[in-house]
């Protein structure tokens, strides 16, 4: 099933001033995760459900090497959670297949995605070289 639906040719997504929520960066967890996690701990959270974006690790899904900045970000989030005794509950694919894979291969309809997804998960689990962001946080 293709979750991403491209717009018809010539159409543009509209962000109407004053109509949509005015702050388009949402909670900006990427820049505020340390403060957010400290607040979670203050509220007594023991588990934090989060997703890892495939595109933050392999932006197009077909790169030869993972994006080190993405790996570092998640490693830092996990270490911050560990510091406060909060266990991460991680989703590794949440309807966010890289757009390039949707456009080039048709998404999950193409078996090539199994190989690419396998490489992505190996990177996350530390099996594939420098991407060991989950393995050493036990």
Task: Show where each model-derived region lies.
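Substrate-binding cleft and catalytic face of glycoside hydrolase catalytic domains
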Residues: 37-138
């Amino acid at each position: 099933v293709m979750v991403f639906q491209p717009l018809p040719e010539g159409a543009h997504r509209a962000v109407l001033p004053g109509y949509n929520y005015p702050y388009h960066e949402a909670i900006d967890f990427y820049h505020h995760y340390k403060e957010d996690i400290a607040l979670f701990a203050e509220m007594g959270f023991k588990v934090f459900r989060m997703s890892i974006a495939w595109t933050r690790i392999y932006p197009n899904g077909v790169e030869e090497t993972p994006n080190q900045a993405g790996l570092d970000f998640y490693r830092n989030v996990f270490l911050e959670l560990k510091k406060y005794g909060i266990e991460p509950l991680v989703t590794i694919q949440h309807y966010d297949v890289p757009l390039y894979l949707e456009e080039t291969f048709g998404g999950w309809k193409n078996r090539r995605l199994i190989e690419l997804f396998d490489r992505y998960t190996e990177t996350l689990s530390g099996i594939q070289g420098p991407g060991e962001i989950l393995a050493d946080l036990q």
